[in-house]
């Protein structure tokens, strides 16, 4: 059956990612300490192999009561995934057709996953996750075009004049800025190397875990309340210095600053 073969195969493929790279023990610890239903959002779920594997791992193997929602722009894929979830009685697993930027289906989430959400779609996913105070954020960004169009830095002109190098540096700087913004908004953030089973090139994984004393960054300082109390308010945020050096202003920055809705 599909349940025994496809899901099992997907779980085996993603086993290392699920248990080690993505650090699911973090969310298991959260659930153990708080018996409420775990709500997980998978933005840009695609064919949803990972979404099914997550549900299988956390619900079937770990016995957690879950509410997992996958969102994607491809309507036919969403219809198919909902049929499979219904067929195999995965009552806590559902799929929606829609754009990440327009999603208003919840005002809270324990965990937000976004793999290969193109360009600024990742920014909207990260912003929503931070706004919901999600305990865990897992993001593998791709197609970082926004910074590539803006970046200008005189000391780097010798490198940026080469299109391919400019493209790759822009992608790295995009994710560095995202990691800084996550840190400044209450998350312990790691930047890890990641290879998934459907995309052979190596990618960057942003793994962010919300700190216990976290608060959304102060609008002016870009620092959490805890950081302000510790005296770090005199230090200009890394994200601001990086953005100013590269002469960039990204969608995630604008969202956090209230310039976009």
Residue ranges and their predicted role:
Residues 66-69:
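Short beta-strand element of Class I
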